Amino acid sequence: MNKQQLKAYFMLMRLHRPIPILLILWPTLTALVLASHGLPDISYLVIFTIGVVVMRTVGCIINDIADVDFDKHVARTNTRPLTSGQLSIKNAIWLCISLTLVAFICVLFLNLYTILLSFVALFLAILYPFCKRFFAIPQLILGLAFNFGIFMAFSAIQNQIPVEAWIFYIATICWTIAYDTIYALADREFDLEIGIKSSAVLFGNKVFRYILLFNFLSLLLLIILGIYCDFNSFFYLGVVICSLFFVRNYFLYKKLGITNCINAFSANHWIGLIIFIIAVIQYI
């Protein structure tokens, strides 16, 4: 394997773009903190961090395999390894299988409940790329998939999925729909041309209102989570800071343009970090 092929595999796994990994990792780590009522055991941190990174790469590979014919028509994606012919579909499938096995080995160190949930997580990861063909809001499926680690974190530590896990899960789904709609704005013109479905296409001229609506719902659910868990004022201060980030992002993505939309999308990882920090503060 030469240097060019290694670079192609690196690009296929999107390791040069860590922001989506962080968007998955922060809610998962936050769930570990909530489930542990404090800092979790280091073994959980290692297992779930590896799991997030590996499954994110698996999702990217599945997405590129599913979209290889569509990506040829989109300026932002027509240089991807599969689309440009740097790697074959067979190469991608073998890499995907290998990484999935790595993730499964990690989950074997957890309890049976979590092992069973891992199959649901894999199903969602496979389902999402194909939803763009028939489901009007594939961002909803992405939200289910990206944040499923929340359920797995609670099941691993508590062997159950309590009410607070559901509240937090739904909050992060709303958040994901909002930030991935921003991301989809960058490709909306191409999606309309080739018939790909997305929330950015569905919401049309009201897309900015819907993004703000889902941001608001995520904040509201975080407040409900804080009340349910009897969190202190630092938690609500963090929610206020998150709302300011949402407002800042609004003025960025409202300008449209690929760069503005991608930058607004990327900034959301700071919101995930803030929520993680204020969760940790609750148990110090």
UniProtKB/Swiss-Prot annotation:
It is an enzyme of class 2 (transferase). One of its GO terms (molecular function) is 4-hydroxybenzoate polyprenyltransferase activity. Pathway: Cofactor biosynthesis; ubiquinone biosynthesis. Its EC number is 2.5.1.39. InterPro entries: HB_polyprenyltransferase-like, Prenyltransferase, UbiA_prenyltransferase, UbiA_prenylTrfase_CS, UbiA_sf. The chain crosses the membrane at residues 19-39, 42-62, 85-105, 107-127, 134-154, 165-185, 211-231, 233-253, 261-281. Its cofactor is Mg(2+). GO terms for biological process: ubiquinone biosynthetic process. PROSITE patterns: UBIA. Keywords: Cell inner membrane, Cell membrane, Magnesium, Membrane, Transferase, Transmembrane, Transmembrane helix, Ubiquinone biosynthesis. It is a multi-pass membrane protein. The keyword Transmembrane helix applies. GO terms for cellular component: plasma membrane. It catalyses: all-trans-octaprenyl diphosphate + 4-hydroxybenzoate = 4-hydroxy-3-(all-trans-octaprenyl)benzoate + diphosphate. It comes from the Bacteria. It holds the Pfam family UbiA. It is found in: Cell inner membrane. CDD domains: PT_UbiA_COQ2 (cd13959). Catalyzes the prenylation of para-hydroxybenzoate (PHB) with an all-trans polyprenyl group. Mediates the second step in the final reaction sequence of ubiquinone-8 (UQ-8) biosynthesis, which is the condensation of the polyisoprenoid side chain with PHB, generating the first membrane-bound Q intermediate 3-octaprenyl-4-hydroxybenzoate. This is 4-hydroxybenzoate octaprenyltransferase. It comes from Francisella tularensis subsp. holarctica (strain LVS). The gene is ubiA.
